[in-house]
Amino acid sequence: MMPECGTQCYLCDLPVRFDNYSGCSHACSYCFARHRIDISQISKKETSKALMNFISGARTKETNWCDWDIPLHWGGLSDPFQPCESKYRSSYKCLKIFADENYPFVVSTKGRIISDKEYLNLIKNCNCVVQISMVCNKYDVLEKGCPSFAERLKILESVSRVARRTIARVQPYMREVFLDVYKNLQLFKNAGAYGAIIEGMKFKRKKDGLVKVGGDFVYQYEDIKKDFLELKQKCHSIGLKIYAGENRIRSLGDSLTCCGVDGLSGFLTNTFNLNHILNGDKVLPSPRQKTDGTAGWF
């Protein structure tokens, strides 16, 4: 298997994801992937060889529109640094390739293994943005297979010392913990984060204060907008960037590229998508995107 496109390809600036594991042991009760597949069965998925093939220019029907070194989103559906990595060490092999090739990527994790010395030594030589998923300590009961919020703060601090950039990934955000998140922004800054990504929770059942968007129930626009703008004001007052991971409020963030790679050399994203077009950006397709037969995934 090769890196593949996610379902948000027509909206996302980094739509090509790489998952070297299938399944997850974090046991987060809110996980969206649990509604699609059985994530309790953990196994190796895409290989380091497949990663190297993509970096070398190989493409599939899903990715044949991409004719440049687009940054990969590593860990789109499964955490690369969950406990099974101690057994398989697949992510270590992939990190070595990323470091040797200086290929740009974003990786998302809640796992503690990323802060082990041998992994930090590789990350130090990688062209990457590391996102640590963390909301507040009240989520600890919802994330029973994960390091605690307090431990993840320490992980963020360790990774921030060596990574090119780190981001606190506040996803999924629930309005009940607004004050906790507001206070935690300073903790993220103190730990070395460059910014924070905020994305509201998607619910499967209707509740008061929710509206249906697509197949999910989400917070009403004015409610999530209000919270986001207050968090944005706080972020800017302490020197943090803020990004909106939710499509409806994307333009309220500091960049339409919500994963936190804005301004980094070597991170050429795909801006030829509805996100940029609807927000008034003048974007053009790449030469490959003009070729017949490459638009299927969009």
Label for each model-derived stretch:
Residues M1-K49:
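Canonical Radical SAM [4Fe-4S] cluster-binding loop centered on the CxxxCxxC motif
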Residues P15, P104-V106, G239-Y243:
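Residue-level detection of beta-strand scaffold positions
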Residues G23, D79, I249:
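Short, glycine-/Ser/Thr-/acidic-enriched flexible segments
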Residues K45-N53, G111-R112:
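Glycine-rich anion/phosphate-binding loops
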Residues S56-D227, K234:
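Conserved AdoMet/S-adenosylmethionine-binding subsite of the radical SAM
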Residues D180-F298:
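Auxiliary Fe-S-binding modules of radical SAM enzymes
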